[in-house]
Amino acid sequence: MKLSKKSIQKAKIELVDFSNCELSTKSYEESSMKKNAIIFKDEKYLLKYMEKNKARHYQDIKNQKETYFNSVYSEYISCHIGKMIGLDIQDTIIGFEKENNKLKRIQYIPCVACKDFCKSGENIVNFERIFEIVNRKENQKYNDENFNDVLKVIEKQEFIDKNNLKENFLNMFVFDSFIGNFDRNLKNFGIIENEKDKTYRIAPIFDCASSLHPKANRKRIKFLANSYERDSQSVYEYALSPNSYFKDDNGTKINYFDFLVNNSFNYNSDIAKSIVKIVPKLIELNNNGGIYDIVDKLDGMIIPERIEVIIKELNLKVDEMFIPTLEISKELLNKEIDEFMLKDYSGFNEYNKEEKSEFLSQIKNILEIQELLVENNSNNFSTRELYRRVDNFLENKNTKDMKAVFVYLEKNDFPIDYIEHFEEKFRLEIEKSTKNKEKSNNSKEINEDEEIGKEKKFDINF
């Protein structure tokens, strides 16, 4: 749908005119959209817009009539949905640029401005580069299109805490399955490097333009809108057809619906955690009209049928894909806790350093799972019951020094609710100890008690 001065004036949101923005010297990766580095309100932005010639250049190989002309809107809608469910995702602004055509008439070119999330002295390191580094170090050749190989490289890399990076990647994967992103290649996610002190952080999610069927032309969209009216089977097939960029171990592209529902995501508890974390927020946003509000604001920029198709498709995905996979995930995570409650840890002191570290990571993971389940009213075990089990383990490791345990929990980022629980136990223990001291007339005994916490350490021997 062509923009005009009239449609811009009637738009439901303010469309920013980027025509006279100062250009920045920052350079970005080439993609299917024309890009310009600009300065807007003293901030760096990447301006992405689809020129007609550019759109033709990136035509679909199988269907020469399909282009990525609607990627501007896909980027804006997807990023705003991600922002509303609390994901760390790039900020975007929708707008236009003016230019004169051959007849010297003003054309209004739709564009989306993506805020640069790198601070001064920082640089984006995409995952393609991380793959190269790990391959060279390990003398391996991990497949950059294989989903499981990506997870292996996440485990092997040493820039970011592997658990945090894995969680971020899987959260992004679940989100991509909702927006139907078919091009989350290794250049489209990564980490940020501070070039001065060589510290690293995970980059926000960016480049969501290959989502929400950006290649579907007006004719296709109108056909789908009519199909929704008729409740046609073709609607279900089209809505659930998007594949991930990544492939399974057989070299087949992962279909999001098959992977999450039919194959139950291979009962991977890490994926289940991301599902329980992301999906309830998507369901709530869909049910309270939040998605409709985001898409409807583009009325006048995109045809009404496209608005209708996007809203109905995402609603269908909630019902057909996400509600079923959420139930599978809850069941799997409750089973994880059930197995932990029955676990025998009597041989912990005979574990080697790696085994001890792994078991304590399991405890942390179980506590995180419980938090997620409680948030969604889906926990089979009470939190008090689980905490009692964890307490029994932590307090029986050849030490009575709760202070040392407390320091360990904080240092290793255990869930805050459990840390506060343990801190309260620590406080009550101090009160009890103080009362006992007051009753005692043995000053030597008092002095010995006061040294507790200063000399003993949590007996894990890392």
Please describe what each predicted stretch is:
Residues 355-370, 407-433:
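Repeat-associated, polar segments at repeat-unit boundaries in modular proteins
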Residues 333-337, 359-365, 382-386, 394-402:
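Short amphipathic alpha-helical heptad-repeat segments
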Residues 2-11:
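Juxta-kinase regulatory segment immediately upstream of eukaryotic protein kinase catalytic domains
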Residues 83, 195-347:
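C-terminal catalytic region of ATP-dependent kinase domains
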Residues 75, 147-217:
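Conserved kinase catalytic-core segment
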Residues 10-134:
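Conserved ATP-binding subdomain of kinase catalytic cores across diverse folds
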Residues 430-462:
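Non-Sec secretion/translocation targeting segments of pathogen effectors
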Residues 345-353, 374-383, 394-401, 413-418:
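Charged, low-complexity interaction regions
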